[in-house]
């Protein structure tokens, strides 16, 4: 009835909303209008529907569903006789959909908004790097304006986003680069041409003439005469000057007397004559002299012309055009046959010449590539002014003083912003061909020097090879091979990351590699805090070598879950190529005992590892502190570990199974294999016994099946191990874990306490004191596996393990109670093993989950109420004692309390077998302790893992039903 009433109300509201809408509503609009009118959502869940559409399909008398062409759904109301008049009035309303649509379109923002940079009165400037890209693009060939963006994207791999720099249109961009780009109107459209193309035309004509000379060398003189007659415009040192760079050994300073003075004048690279025609005539005379002396000794110019003409490099350069023209025409005037003959006669140069060639090539490439970059946008006039200002300061000019000195020299500001540079440092860095930058003594500023003068000083200080050694090595008949190193160039000394050349040279040249500031250096991981005796914890068994030597990893929010989260973060971090390259560990940073991050190829996870041994230059042994494994890996797989991944302590704890030993001198392969099968891929319940020399002795129990399996008991029952009569502490103390030296004790537990737990005293072995405190779950950061009631309604709630090892010859005693009957039966209790039987109350009395009434056999609170123990007369087979009723108060969450009376009977059973024979039959390590019987009427779930642990240890078992 309630659902029918709700359904009728919803139909009424939906009909009202749809009738009021002239053009219908979508499902989303209907839900929104319903929420605005009623104040709550449509109760589809309470009516048993999964969606609003499913609800509307069940209301055909109220809603019409229309599917439009674009796939959207529109809802309209079904009009009946009672609502027809209202529907007619709504249909006569004035349609305002146009205004609504217009307003909506104004408010709609694009998914990927592009906000233009709002500027003030200052006109935007295109950055120098972008100018350099445009100049490089147009230097190949002119482009139409419509094809500019496509060509820019195909050449540089990115789009030309001029709006990022403050421009609103391409017209503004072209206006800002009128100094390098010229727009010409053609029939095809606006054509973008690079300005100052005369130099390009001259270089092109030179290339054509050179190719003609290579085909017909006899026409050399005619071509030279034609070049002399051609009118030559004065050369302008612009950014688009294209010349031929020639790599040659150094020119000799002294010549023999047999050589003509014309040869001396023509081969000197320091000729400074204003008459260019005279220099060309000298080159013609040089060619004639070379032809006349074919059979004579080769002149000194052989090593100048020995380099073939096709090996010259075509690139932008700042080398003087006059010197380049001279060397070019000198090469062109030499016939090809003579060049080949001299080249075959010449021998390999020595190491000094090759070193000079390497430096020369490096310098030439640096000049060419620097001019090709952002520095090409700087005009020659500004270059000369900056160079002149720097030359006035022989000791160097500070970069911070350059704008002031430049203004005092030229009377105007340094226009670095107008050229597209963000700072003076960026401008100076682009002028690496004319300026040299060095750091000051204090390291707070930079000094500028003239690059040419600096190179001359360096060459003079380093010393050039002598002329005689060069000539003798060049003209000698002996053939020697000298390996030539690849050349790498740093474009700017300000930013040394601008590297051109093989990456190996850059890595070798860097003497000191930067180590990330958050990299872990000379630190140790912390161990997990030591657990008290009798503490129960879930564990994973790792790296099993034998039942006496394995590792355990604790389960819990503060241990295994945090480790998984850390590994996920490490995978996300180190999977980035930039981060992985930054944290690469070099050979000089690898040392034994240091912790690093490691990923083996084929695996997706990163692990924390500690270097244990370095085998050779490539391989090393590492220890996994979180899993206990040892593996051999390559050095290249290591990465520096970030400091944030050192918070979690090492998770692997070296452990051993107590009270069991191998049947022979060593553990058999069958026993090790069986132990590995029992521990594989499943969490186990572990109970801490003690620590001996940092090795945890722990009992392991498999509770995944219906019947609990205790590993030490199973190994002994199958004959794979034997019970140890005494715990071999002395033997184990000699076997220290070698990997514990790489870890440091936990900060949560002082070292004094851990030492007391690891080495038990002799006095503690004779008696077992009562535990009065229970370790809190949050102290160790471990999940507490069981709960127990606050009342002390079982005999063993004040009983706990001692800090020392158990003595098999002495049976533990029950805590003293101030009753007369207990004192009378004290002798029989100390000399005979007992069995206890407890009859639990009916399960219907329990008002809370059964897990809250777990029985703790390990730790509990002290009893708050006294108990009266009544003992029945002993029979021949067993001693029976009955315990009176006791009440235990349980605190509830809401503040209310409820009491439950548990009637329990305590029976003492006398065994026929002596105690020594009973120890042989029992496989539990806790020998000599009292046994507790539970009737089968009790609920097994209420026992918990602690009681199940005692059951397998023959301390707790089911009592036989009374007949």
UniProtKB/Swiss-Prot annotation:
Among CDD domains, the record links this protein to: LOTUS_3_TDRD5, Tudor_TDRD5
Tell me where the transmembrane regions lie. none
**UniProt entry keywords in alphabetical sequence:** Cytoplasm, Developmental protein, Differentiation, Repeat, Spermatogenesis
The annotated region (Disordered) lies at 233-274, 745-768
Q: Does the keyword Repeat apply?
A: yes
User: What processes in GO biological process is this protein linked to?
Assistant: P granule organization; spermatid development; transposable element silencing by piRNA-mediated DNA methylation
| Occurrences of domain HTH OST-type (ranges) | 6-79, 122-197, 378-452
Respond yes or no to whether keyword Repeat is given for this record.
yes
Q: Name any one Pfam family assigned in the record.
A: OST-HTH
The UniProt regions of compositional bias labelled Low complexity, in chain numbering, are: 745-767
- Gene Ontology cellular-component annotations: chromatoid body; pi-body
Location of the protein in the cell: Cytoplasm
The record, for InterPro entries, names: LOTUS-like, OST-HTH/LOTUS_dom, SNase_OB-fold_sf, Tudor, Tudor_domain_containing
- Composition bias of kind Polar residues appears in 254-274
* Occurrences of domain Tudor (ranges): 589-648
Give the protein's function.
Required during spermiogenesis to participate in the repression transposable elements and prevent their mobilization, which is essential for the germline integrity. Probably acts via the piRNA metabolic process, which mediates the repression of transposable elements during meiosis by forming complexes composed of piRNAs and Piwi proteins and govern the methylation and subsequent repression of transposons.
Question: What protein family is recorded?
Answer: Belongs to the TDRD5 family.
Q: Which PANTHER family match?
A: TUDOR DOMAIN CONTAINING PROTEIN (PTHR22948), TUDOR DOMAIN-CONTAINING PROTEIN 5 (PTHR22948:SF19)
Q: What is this protein called?
A: Tudor domain-containing protein 5
Species assigned in the record: Xenopus tropicalis
Lineage of origin? Eukaryota, Metazoa, Chordata, Craniata, Vertebrata
């Amino acid at each position: 009835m309630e659902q029918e009433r709700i359904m009728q109300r919803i139909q009424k509201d939906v009909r009202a909303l749809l009738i009021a809408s002239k053009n219908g509503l979508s499902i989303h609009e209907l839900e929104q209008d319903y929420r605005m009118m009623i104040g709550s959502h449509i109760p589809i869940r309470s009516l048993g529907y999964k969606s609003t559409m499913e609800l509307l399909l069940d209301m055909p008398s109220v809603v019409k569903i229309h599917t439009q062409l674009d796939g959207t759904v529109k809802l309209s109301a079904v009009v009946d006789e009672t609502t027809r008049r209202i529907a007619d009035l709504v249909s006569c309303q004035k349609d305002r959909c146009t205004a609504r649509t217009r307003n909506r379109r104004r408010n709609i923002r694009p998914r990927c908004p592009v906000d233009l940079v709002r500027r003030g009165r200052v006109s935007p400037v295109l950055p120098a790097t972008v100018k350099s890209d445009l100049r490089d693009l147009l230097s190949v060939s002119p482009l139409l304006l419509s094809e500019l963006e496509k060509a820019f994207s195909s050449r540089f791999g990115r789009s030309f986003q001029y709006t990022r720099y403050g421009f609103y249109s391409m017209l503004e961009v072209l206006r800002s680069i009128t100094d390098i780009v010229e727009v010409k109107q053609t029939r095809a459209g606006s054509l973008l041409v690079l300005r100052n193309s005369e130099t390009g035309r001259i270089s092109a004509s030179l290339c054509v003439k050179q190719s003609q000379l290579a085909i017909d060398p006899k026409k050399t003189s005619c071509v030279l005469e034609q070049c002399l007659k051609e009118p030559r415009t004065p050369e302008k040192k612009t950014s688009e000057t294209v010349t031929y760079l020639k790599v040659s050994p150094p020119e000799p300073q002294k010549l023999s007397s047999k050589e003509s003075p014309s040869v001396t004048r023509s081969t000197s690279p320091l000729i400074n004559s204003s008459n260019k025609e005279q220099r060309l005539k000298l080159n013609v005379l040089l060619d004639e002299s070379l032809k006349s002396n074919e059979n004579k000794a080769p002149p000194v110019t052989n090593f100048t012309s020995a380099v073939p003409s096709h090996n010259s490099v075509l690139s932008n350069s700042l080398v003087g055009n006059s010197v380049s023209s001279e060397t070019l025409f000198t090469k062109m005037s030499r016939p090809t046959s003579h060049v080949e003959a001299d080249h075959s006669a010449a021998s390999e140069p020595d190491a000094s010449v090759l070193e000079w060639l390497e430096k020369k090539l490096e310098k030439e490439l640096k000049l060419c590539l620097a001019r090709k970059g952002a520095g090409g946008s700087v005009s020659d006039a500004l270059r000369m002014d900056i160079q002149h200002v720097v030359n006035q300061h022989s000791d160097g000019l500070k970069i911070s003083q350059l704008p002031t000195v430049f203004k005092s020299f030229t009377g105007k500001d340094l226009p670095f912003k107008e050229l597209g540079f963000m700072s003076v440092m960026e401008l100076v860095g682009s002028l690496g061909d004319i300026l040299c930058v060095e750091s000051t003594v204090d390291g707070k500023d930079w000094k500028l020097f003239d690059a040419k003068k600096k190179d001359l000083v360096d060459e003079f200080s380093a010393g050039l090879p002598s002329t005689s050694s060069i000539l003798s090595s060049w003209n000698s008949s002996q053939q020697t091979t000298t390996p030539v190193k690849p050349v790498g160039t740093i474009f700017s000394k300000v930013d040394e990351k601008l590297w051109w050349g093989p990456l190996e040279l850059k890595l070798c040249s860097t003497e000191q590699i930067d180590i990330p500031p958050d990299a872990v250096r000379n630190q140790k991981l912390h161990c997990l805090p030591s657990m008290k005796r009798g503490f129960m914890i879930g564990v994973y068994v790792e790296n099993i070598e034998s039942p006496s030597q394995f590792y355990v990893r604790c389960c819990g929010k503060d241990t295994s879950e945090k480790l998984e989260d850390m590994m996920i973060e490490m995978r996300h971090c180190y999977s980035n190529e930039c981060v992985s390259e930054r944290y690469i560990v070099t050979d000089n940073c690898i040392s034994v005992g240091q912790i690093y991050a490691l990923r083996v190829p084929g695996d997706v996870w990163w692990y924390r590892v500690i270097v244990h041994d370095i085998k050779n230059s490539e391989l090393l042994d590492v220890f996994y502190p979180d899993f206990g494994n040892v593996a051999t890996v390559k050095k290249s797989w290591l990465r520096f570990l970030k400091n944030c991944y050192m918070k979690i302590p090492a998770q692997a704890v070296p452990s051993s199974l107590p009270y069991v030993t191998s049947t022979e001198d060593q553990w058999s392969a069958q026993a090790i294999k069986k132990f590995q099968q029992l521990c594989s891929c499943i969490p186990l319940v572990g109970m801490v016994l003690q620590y001996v020399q940092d090795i945890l002795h722990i009992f392991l129990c498999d509770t995944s099946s219906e019947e609990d399996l205790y590993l030490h008991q199973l190994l002994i029952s199958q004959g794979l191990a034997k019970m140890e009569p005494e715990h071999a502490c002395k033997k184990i103390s000699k076997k220290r874990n070698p990997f514990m030296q790489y870890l440091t004790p936990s900060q949560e537990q002082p070292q004094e306490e851990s030492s007391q737990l690891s080495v038990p005293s002799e006095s503690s072995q004779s008696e077992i004191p009562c535990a009065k405190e229970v370790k809190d779950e949050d102290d160790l950061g471990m999940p507490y596996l069981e709960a127990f009631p606050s009342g002390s309604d079982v005999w063993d709630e004040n009983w706990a393990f001692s800090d020392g090892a158990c003595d098999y010859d002495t049976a533990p005693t029950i805590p003293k109670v101030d009753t007369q009957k207990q004192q009378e039966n004290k002798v029989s209790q100390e000399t005979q093993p007992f069995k206890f039987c407890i009859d639990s109350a009916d399960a219907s009395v329990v008002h809370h989950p059964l897990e809250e009434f777990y029985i703790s056999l390990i730790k509990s609170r002290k009893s708050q109420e006294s108990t009266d123990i009544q003992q029945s007369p002993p029979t021949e087979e067993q001693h029976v004692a009955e315990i009176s009723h006791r009440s235990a108060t349980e605190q509830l969450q809401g503040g209310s309390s409820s009491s439950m009376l548990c009637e329990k009977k305590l029976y003492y059973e006398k065994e026929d077998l002596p105690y020594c024979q009973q120890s042989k039959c029992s496989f539990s390590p806790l020998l000599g302790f009292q046994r507790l019987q539970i009737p089968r009427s009790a609920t097994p779930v209420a026992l918990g893992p602690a009681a199940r642990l005692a059951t397998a240890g023959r301390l707790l078992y089911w009592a036989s039903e009374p007949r």
